[in-house]
């Protein structure tokens, strides 16, 4: 009996708390207070991957530092013989990769072109 009364009392308290929160929400925001946010949620996986891919890789830097520690100072002639190769950005087009020809996207057909092709098929 006591457990039932205790549960009922807690339920009443929770309902009163919720009603007070609803009252303050209605006073401050009105009916819009119960509507969902119109903004879409952020795509956090996309943002994290974009940040990781745009920042220079820490592994490559650590690897280069370790190699530099192992090898003693090189002479100036050896440094000039082995220049570092620059890595191209994966999303930027390099002139070598594109070749000499530049391609344009396909042309949109007008409604007249569509009708002419249909009449030619018949």
From Swiss-Prot:
GO cellular component terms listed in the entry, alphabetical order: cytosol; nucleoplasm
Region (Disordered): 48-122
Annotated gene: POLR1D
Compositional bias per record (Basic residues), positions renumbered to this chain: 84-96
Highest taxon of the lineage: Eukaryota
Basic and acidic residues: compositionally biased ranges: 57-83, 110-122
Name used for this protein in its record: Protein POLR1D, isoform 2
Keyword vocabulary terms for this entry: Acetylation, Phosphoprotein
Modification sites for N-acetylmethionine: 1
InterPro entries: POLR1D-like
């Amino acid at each position: 009996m006591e457990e039932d009364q205790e549960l009922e009392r807690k339920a009443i308290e929770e309902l009163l708390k919720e009603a007070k929160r609803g009252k303050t929400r209605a006073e401050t925001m009105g009916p819009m207070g119960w509507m969902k946010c119109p903004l879409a949620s952020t795509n956090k996986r996309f943002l994290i991957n974009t940040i990781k891919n745009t920042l220079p890789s820490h592994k490559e830097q650590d690897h280069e530092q370790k190699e530099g520690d192992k090898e003693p100072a090189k002479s100036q002639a050896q440094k000039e013989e082995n220049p570092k190769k620059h890595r191209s950005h994966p999303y930027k087009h390099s002139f070598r990769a594109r070749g000499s020809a530049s391609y344009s996207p396909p042309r949109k057909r007008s409604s007249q072109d569509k009708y002419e092709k249909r009449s030619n098929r018949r």
